[in-house]
Amino acid sequence: PPPLAGIRVVDLTHHLGGPLATMYLAQLGADVVKVEPPEGDGWRHVDSVRGESRVFHAVNRGKRGIVLDLATPEGREALGRLVDRADVMVHSFTPGVAERLGAGPEEALARNPRLVHCSLSAFGPEARRGTD
C-alpha cells in the first residue's frame, strides 16, 4: 500500500502552495478532501479551457471535493465533523481567519486531539508581506 494509505486530510487551502502540498499527500496515498466555498475555488476560473481550469485540476488531482459555506453555522459544523475524523488539516487562510471559522488550532485540537494542524500562510503568521 502507499505510504500514507489510511491517512485522512481536510484540505482548506487555496492559491498554489497549499494545494500543491496536499496534492503530494494524495499522491502518497492519503485520502484528501478539498473543501471549497459555494462559488468554487478561485483557481477554477484561472486559465480555463472550455470552462475547466488546467491549473485547478493540476494541483487538485487525486482529491475528493466538498462544497461548504463556512460563513454559516451549518457549514462550520460540517467542517467540524470532517475534522473529527481527520488525521491532518491543512489551511492557507490569512492570520485570524481559521479561528473565526472555528478551524484554528485551539478549536480543531479541542475536537480532535490527535489532529495534525498545518497552517501555510503566504506571508507568515503575522501577515507581513516580504520586503526583501
Over which residues does each language-model region extend?
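N-terminal helix-loop segment corresponding to the beta1-alpha1 unit
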Residues: 1-132
